[in-house]
Amino acid sequence: MSAVLDHDDHDHDDHHDHAPTGWRRWVYATNHKDIGTLYLLFSFTMLMVGGVLALLIRAELFQPGLQLVNPELFNQLTTMHGLIMVFGAIMPGFVGFANWMVPLQIGAADMAFARMNNFSFWLLIPAGLMIVGSFFMPGGAPAAGWTLYAPLTLQMGPSMDAGIFALHILGASSIMGSINIIVTILNMRAPGMTLMKMPMFCWTWLITAYLLIAVMPVLAGAITMTLTDRHFGTSFFNPGGGGDPVMYQHIFWFFGHPEVYIMILPAFGIISQVVPAFSRKRLFGYASMVYATSSIAILSFVVWAHHMFTVGMPVTGQLFFMYSTMLIAVPTAVKIFNWIATMWRGSMTFETPMLFAVGFIFVFTMGGFTGLILAMAPIDIQLQDTYYVVAHFHYVLVAGSLYGMFAGFYYWSPKWTGVMYNEARGKIHFWWSLIAFNVTFFPMHFLGLAGMPRRYADYPMQFADFNAIASVGAFAFGLAQVYFFFWIALPVMMGKGEKASQKPWEGAEGLEWEIPSPAPFHTFETPPKLNPAANRVID
């Protein structure tokens, strides 16, 4: 191996070459690996908090009638579950993956702006505390739904202001993280790594970062207008003063639809790394994958009103948004076709990362089909705000984003920790999660088709059976994640397990497998020399 990679063999006089110790290592962290770890820990913590809220929702809906919570608290639970999962669990989780893997995959020494990286993480802590703490404010947490539609938000208690402030902080954190990722990818690639030789995970994050910078200010604008309507006498969304609540929906969903692609594109990137590794083949159609990802990002800006077919829109508008939404299925199908083509006639083995990747493709595609169904305006007018919609977006967000993160964890954790996770337990986690997930959300399609509306604490008797099944599935799914934490994640974090080799996966390619396991504190301090495919370091 070249001198670039001999990290520990020679003496370093410089103080910064040794990892700082104790609490300072984490509080003052500027190393991309430490910050990535912090993001992932924060993300998992919020996943557990959001999960507890979800289980309270499902416990309430286990039977008709009011069991545990009153309707006001129920609406707080649904609102906060959505906000915490989207802004506290999924987004920081993928930023953690980006921090850890992007510099390793492009042969960079670190992220471009190390201190800004630290700042963008530590902003999450007060924001998270404020969101969770809003439950303890007068009047309870925000209860307007995670979309925070006016006019309800104009009548909420003081916790609404805390929620708005927290979202502003999270938005600032996301924008800083995105600037960091863009500058790192565009400026810090090792010589010889052109953009079209970059790993797919870096591509998806580059595109995601541009999306974040484009739409986070739009959310900030919407919630700032809500704030001024609440306290400063404006009437942006207040019909009494000549405002329009529907305008809020337009502004929010212009942010909200690109946002759901922000949450899925990094998962696409992880799947595009895992599938070739366990098929022992190059990714099929690399260029088309890049163009498909870009197409998804561009199209995501012209589909927002499909969330609003029922608010009163000219038929021309409905047709435009219906067709543009159906069009986005084309690049998505290109990606799914390419993953299947990558597996075609490959020497496949099914270790846990591959199981999650195949599970992702299968269940995410089901979510995509229900999305295609909801894209059709006449059908959506029937199904809007029913449990069919809940089923659809949990199929793409849980079986999409969350499974993508699990695949990434199992794939890269040997590089992070230096030890292998327990393969048998990983497989248990996969099957348990997959079955429990489908038991939870599949019946919701039937509930929605039968007309059960979302966001109600009580429901008529005819919906009882499927709700009971869904609640049992939800508790099983939650238990599977507790199992994952205590029996899979904790042991590897504590360094228990078989020692991981430099490249534990036979078919894996890329610069992250050219450094020792666990990854040294400093990597690629001098830019590595790469082979023509830019996936190996040469002497």
Spans of model-derived segments:
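Membrane-embedded and interfacial regions of multi-pass energy-transducing membrane proteins
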Residues: 2-539
